[in-house]
Amino acid sequence: MAAVTEHTETLHEQPLFWRSAQGADPPVLYLHGVPTSSADWVPFLERTGGLAPDLPGFGRTGKRGDNDYTMAGYDRFVEAFLDHLEIERVRLVAHDWGVVGLLWAQRFPERVERLVLVNAVPLLPGYRWHPVARLWRMPAVGEVAMGFATRAALRRTLPQPLFDDAWRHFDQGTQRAILRLYRSSPEDALARAGLDLGAIECPAMVVWGDSDRYIHSRFAEAYADALGGQAELLHLPDAGHWPWYDRPDVIDRITAFLVD
């Protein structure tokens, strides 16, 4: 397995943290979701190599109050991160809110060689936010709800291997980023954000833990239908929102697709 290296540099006058490992060319770009960090992707980096940044507001990347914690802001971050490292093409893997990478991919489909979506927030018509997200989207109520995000509550939510890192970085800056992201993302905006998914014509794989309490498995088919190229579907009935922790064997399935 490849050794995973941690990096901290400065981008836009604030810390930028990412993990990397030697591997495939073009590299795999792994984008994490809420409320975790690039730590999600260590088992993949060890197998495929690649890059996994902490998105702004999460992990060890900057959490300034004046950051743009919107879909458009994260889209610009992905572009800036790749430009900073002078990377032209990638194999893209996105989980949950890592789906912001699809905004970048729709603008630059020629820069994406392969695509894997794993229980990704639907940039599609018909999605309705889950109950916790609806609370977060409400002014004042969301702040109160964050107050109930205790150590015990987060432990019940996350796969055990991710808990320590997520809790260590689940500070006021991360909570602010989460609230701003959800509040700037009404359901109709999600659907509009995916209007050009058909422009992404590279080979794709859509992986779904069907026991996800946040996103219904029907959106796996919806994503496969919306993408412009051939998309392989993999449903995992016995897995949840982070399916590779419930079914570690899926890591090898995704790895084989990425490096084929």
Regions found by a protein language model. Give the residues of each.
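A short loop-to-beta-strand scaffold at the N-terminal edge of the catalytic core in hydrolase folds
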Residues: 12-20
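Active-site loop/oxyanion-hole signature of alpha/beta-hydrolase fold enzymes
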Residues: 52-93, 97
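Conserved serine/cysteine hydrolase catalytic core
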Residues: 174-225, 235
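Conserved alpha/beta-hydrolase catalytic His-Asp/Glu region
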Residues: 126, 146-198
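Catalytic histidine-centered segment of alpha/beta-hydrolase-like enzymes
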Residues: 239-248
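Short N-terminal helix/helix-N-cap motif within the alpha/beta-hydrolase-1
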Residues: 38-43, 60-63, 102, 125-126, ...
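Flexible "cap/lid" loop of the alpha/beta hydrolase fold
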Residues: 106, 114-143
